[in-house]
Swiss-Prot record:
Top-level lineage group: Bacteria
Function: Catalyzes the conversion of 3-deoxy-D-arabino-heptulosonate 7-phosphate (DAHP) to dehydroquinate (DHQ).
Annotated InterPro entries: Dehydroquinate_synthase, DHQ_synth_AroB, DHQ_synth_fam, DHQS/DOIS_N, DHQS_C
Species of provenance: Saccharophagus degradans (strain 2-40 / ATCC 43961 / DSM 17024)
Gene that this sequence comes from: aroB
GO terms (BP aspect): amino acid biosynthetic process; aromatic amino acid family biosynthetic process; chorismate biosynthetic process
Protein's name according to its UniProt entry: 3-dehydroquinate synthase
Co-factor binding details: Binds 1 divalent metal cation per subunit. Can use either Co(2+) or Zn(2+).
Length: 362
């Protein structure tokens, strides 16, 4: 088992990574505020792991479970209210702890419920998809979607602990594995060229679910994110680089309907667009852009946005992106291999060509 730490002063917490952790009560019980717990999961994960995991909390004064519908389309206020209903009906107080057993949707909604319930209670992240293990479970971003924008309603609320059981990836659908790889590749593009090169050499092993390769990819991804979050917890500065591909990607998700494109699929296409824009402006050379696109494709991800989306469609959603500052669009773009920046200094014609899929790269 590997242990990492997110260093945030009195809000610091560990990340445990290893096999068989779902069955280890010592990774959960010490992080409860009292003997009361609400486990939040979804229909898919509940059928696989719900009963055995819930048995860890036998003997609690209060132990309840709420099972949400599975899918991004249910990451909304209506589903969030199901969590609040369970808390109130079970008479949970400020000493309760919520436990998110599921992917990013479950984790984001559970964390937001924990941030809001009685103005803040503790929660534990138990991510069950590759994407949530390497990204959404770490860093304290929580929230729900709105028909007009993704993750526009939420809060920063750090978990008590993140428990990553690599065994759960054995039951992860192939499409979800590819979606998670988008966020793994992102870390190589924004912060670690050596890791990017390692991914190029090991992408086949990762897609074949090689245990050692997956554990290293998860560990390195979490370490990069933990380091960034420690510098900028509330995304007022450097943390925004974690959104590489997300401005384009969120536009795709919003336009296509939440869940029709998985988040990682949209981010994959969005990273291709970000690389192409940087290449058009001469920030990265064409060979590196082609390597990035090839790696994204090798992970089974789309490398182009939906043909139905026009530049106007993109701009409609990008105009309400959370990185917009004083009415100006800001993008996260690669500026050299293994490095990205947040900038509003991009060429408008190059952006138009990227959105319209016109013209040649560098």
């Amino acid at each position: 088992m590997k242990t990492l730490h997110v260093d945030l002063g009195d809000r610091s917490y560990p990340i445990f990574i290893g096999a068989g952790l779902l069955a280890n009560p010592e990774k959960f019980l010490p992080y409860l505020a009292a003997k009361q717990v609400l486990v939040v999961t979804n229909t898919t994960i509940d059928a696989l792991y719900g009963d055995s995991f819930f048995s860890l909390f036998e003997g609690m004064d209060k132990a309840h479970k709420v099972v949400l519908p599975d899918g991004e389309s249910y990451k909304n206020l209506e589903a969030l209210n199901q969590i609040f209903d369970a808390l109130l009906e079970g008479k949970h107080n400020r000493k309760t702890t919520l436990v998110a057993l599921g992917g990013g949707v479950v984790g984001d909604m559970t964390g937001f419920a924990a941030a809001a319930y009685q103005r803040g209670v503790g929660f534990i992240q138990v991510p069950t998809t590759l994407l949530s293990q390497v990204d959404s479970s770490v860093g304290g971003k929580t929230g729900v979607n709105h028909p007009l924008g993704k993750n526009m309603i939420g809060a920063f609320h750090q978990p008590n602990v993140v428990v990553i059981d690599t065994d759960v990836l054995k039951t992860l659908p192939d499409r979800e594995l590819s979606a998670g790889m988008a966020e793994v590749i992102k870390y190589g593009l924004i912060a670690d060229y050596e890791f990017f090169c390692w991914l190029e050499s090991n992408v086949k092993a990762l897609m074949a679910r090689d245990v050692d390769a997956l554990e290293y990819a998860i560990e390195r991804s979490c370490q990069i994110k933990a380091d960034v979050v420690a510098q900028d917890e509330t995304e007022s500065g450097i943390r925004a680089i974690l959104n590489l591909g997300h401005t384009f990607g969120h536009a795709i998700e919003s336009d296509q309907g939440y869940g029709n494109w998985l988040h990682g699929e949209a981010v994959g296409a969005g990273m291709v667009m970000a690389c192409e824009l940087s290449c058009r402006m001469g920030w990265i050379d064409k060979p590196f852009c082609e390597r990035a696109v090839a790696l994204i494709a090798a992970a089974g991800l789309p490398i182009a946005p939906p043909e139905s989306m026009s530049p106007e469609d993109f701009m409609k959603y990008m105009a309400v992106d959370k990185k917009v500052l004083d009415g100006g669009l800001r993008l996260v773009l690669p500026n050299k291999p293994g490095s990205s920046i947040v900038t509003d200094s991009f060429d408008a014609d190059a952006l138009a060509a990227t959105l319209g899929r016109t013209g040649q790269l560098g």
